[in-house]
Amino acid sequence: MFYSLFFSTLPLFGLVFIGFISGKFDLLNKSDSKVFLKLVGLIIVPTLGIKIIGNFRYEFINWNLYFYYFLTQSIIYFLGFSIAKIIFKRQFSESIIIGMTSSFSNHLFFVYPIALFEFGPKDIVPIETIISVDFITVGLSVCALELASHKKINFGQIFLSQLKNPALIGLFLGLTIFFFQIHIPLSVNRLVNFICDAGTPCALIAMGILLSYQTDKTQIKLSLVITLLKIFIFPLIQFFILYLINYDLNISRTTMMVAAAPIGAMGLVFASIYNVTTDAVVRSGIISYVLALISICLLYTSPSPRDS
């Protein structure tokens, strides 16, 4: 399992390395990384809503299991935000990014492809549920970032600005296609797939570019906090909650794999769009990717405690 996961994720590290080398040799710079991340945030995220939410198998949703995941995600979000704000004295917007990064997993490009080959359709649905509902949680985080970016709070202006919120646009488009059973022509489907496939390369090359720049000790400490929360605390709290309520850990295995996955790209994407420091995010990305190779393998191969 480890070797399979390692070689399947090797191209991801390759993309980061390409960005890193490009940054070191001044082929690409921070401005270029912002263009890549803006492309992901404003174009690819809404398109992912069409692809994922529009084709979701809602009849198999396990809302109880998702609630326990969301509860854990909320705890980690709050911890990440509070540590950044209270202990490290970071600004409100940066604290939101730290909370987002600590609690959002790279489920779409890290766990989901593995699950497609290793699990049955019903076991994959919990991952699809998390991916779909994260459009709401990401959208709410973007609302908070928008609020933090205004010196004077004008709720009317903030409300209108949410008409351009990429996550909410993706959610709206996906739900519209699903509820009205809109048939998408093959040519449009191909366009959607082309756009979505660009997401990972753009985000990881941008991460590599930003990684090539030096940072301060505070950002390094924050990157370790994010990694600790995401790779260790998140799955431990998730396991504790499920074990405490006597939940079948075999049914929740894919959900646990998402909990142990590396950080997602949304924190980095919207940090760049809202001009928030990204140094801690990019460094925690590399560390969490390496550690997730071990954590996900352990969760996949470990027997359920209730089976022993």
Name each model-derived stretch:
Residues 1-305:
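Alpha-helical transmembrane segments of multi-pass small-molecule/ion transporters
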Residues 308:
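Extended, polar beta-sheet/loop recognition surfaces of beta-rich domains
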